[in-house]
Amino acid sequence: MAGNSGFDFTTEKKNLKYPDFWAVDSLFMKCFPQRIIHGTEPAHDNDILLSESFARKYWKHPQDAIGSLLTQKTPSGFYIPNPIQLRVSGIMADAPENSSFQHEGYYLNNSENGDYHNKENWMYIANTHVHLVLKEGIRFNDFSQHLLSSLHEMEILKNVKFSIIPLFQKHFEFAAEESFSYS
């Protein structure tokens, strides 16, 4: 899961001011299913699922956004050789208040073209979040120590700070019923 570039997007004479869109892979949707209220889940790279509140800001009815092409806008003085183009595939319900996933959209990016051994490609890691499900019997503290020591052995990552937060602590603030549900 990685944050967007910090640029505006445009569509149909609308300027979408610095949207909080995140690139995710198909496993994100399986681990963190979103409640789809219009359209479908992203099926192809650069398909995007917008939050209902974001769609309402720019379209009269949220479902009117479906099929729209959102193009990354290059600010004056910047050059982007391949601006991101996203196609709206669906509208998701806004996340509950106790969720740490309060983003305005998730777009599919299953690209396997990245050369992760090239240190220049790691410059974007500061805005990247990786979510893991540990196998049964793996202790969080043991896994954390092993992962952190392994990451810091890589020369290209010596100056990068990592933190590992258990999802149940990061993602949920349990209410009295101690459960989480979209319904």
Which residue ranges define each predicted feature?
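Glycine-rich loop motifs involved in handling phospho/adenylate chemistry
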Residues: 41-44
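His/Cys-centered metal/cofactor-coordination and adjacent catalytic loops
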Residues: 47
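Mid-to-C-terminal secondary-structure elements
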Residues: 5-7, 22-37, 50-182
